[in-house]
């Protein structure tokens, strides 16, 4: 009975270790992906967008300032 219990403990510890290693690898992969995305976003800030064209407003047709 003792060998079965020790085998079960070893098996559970192995599963726990495997889970920790996989979660660590996923965390590293996410961190490198986020790091790459951050670098791509910084490149966008190095080159500012050109200014947009001004909005055309036609001259006012009011009679203000034109006399009677």
Curated annotation (Swiss-Prot):
Biological-process GO terms, alphabetical: defense response to bacterium; response to bacterium; response to cold; response to ethylene; response to jasmonic acid; response to salicylic acid; response to salt stress; response to water deprivation
Biased composition annotated in UniProt, kind: Pro residues: 48-57
Ranges of Basic and acidic residues composition bias in the record: 37-47
Phenotype upon loss of function: Slightly increased growth and fresh weight.
Induction: Induced by cold, drought and salt stress, but repressed by pathogenic bacteria Pseudomonas syringae pv. tomato (Pst) DC3000, jasmonate (MeJA), ethylene (ET) and salicylic acid (SA), mainly in shoots.
Subcellular location(s) per record: Cell membrane; Secreted, Extracellular space, Apoplast
GO annotation, cellular component aspect: apoplast; plasma membrane
Main localization (coarse): membrane
Keyword Hydrolase: no
Tissue occurrence: Mostly expressed in stems and flowers and, to a lower extent, in seedlings shoots, roots, siliques, seeds and leaves.
Motif (SxS motif essential for MIK2 binding): 60-62
Signal sequence, renumbered to the chain: 1-31
GO molecular function, one term: receptor serine/threonine kinase binding
Keyword terms of this UniProt record: Apoplast, Cell membrane, Cleavage on pair of basic residues, Membrane, Secreted, Signal
UniProt-annotated stretches for the region Disordered: 33-68
Motif stretch (SCOOP motif): 54-68
Subunit and partners: Interacts with MIK2 (via extracellular leucine-rich repeat domain); this interaction triggers the formation of complex between MIK2 and the BAK1/SERK3 and SERK4 coreceptors, and subsequent BAK1 activation by phosphorylation.
Role played: Brassicaceae-specific phytocytokine (plant endogenous peptide released into the apoplast) perceived by MIK2 in a BAK1/SERK3 and SERK4 coreceptors-dependent manner, that modulates various physiological and antimicrobial processes including growth prevention and reactive oxygen species (ROS) response regulation. Promotes the expression of immune-related marker genes (e.g. WRKY30, WRKY33 and CYP81F2) in a MIK2-dependent manner. Inhibits root growth and regulates root meristems. Prevents general growth and development. Exhibits antibacterial effects against Pseudomonas syringae pv.
Family of the protein in this entry: Belongs to the serine rich endogenous peptide (SCOOP) phytocytokine family.
Protein name stated in the entry: Serine rich endogenous peptide 13
Organism of this sequence: Arabidopsis thaliana (Mouse-ear cress)
């Amino acid at each position: 009975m003792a060998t079965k219990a020790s085998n079960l403990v070893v098996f559970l510890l192995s599963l726990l270790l495997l889970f920790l290693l996989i979660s660590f690898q996923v965390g590293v992969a996410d961190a490198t992906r986020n790091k790459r995305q951050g670098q791509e976003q910084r490149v966008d800030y190095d080159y500012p967008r050109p200014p947009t064209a001004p909005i055309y407003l036609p001259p006012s047709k009011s009679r203000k300032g034109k006399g009677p």
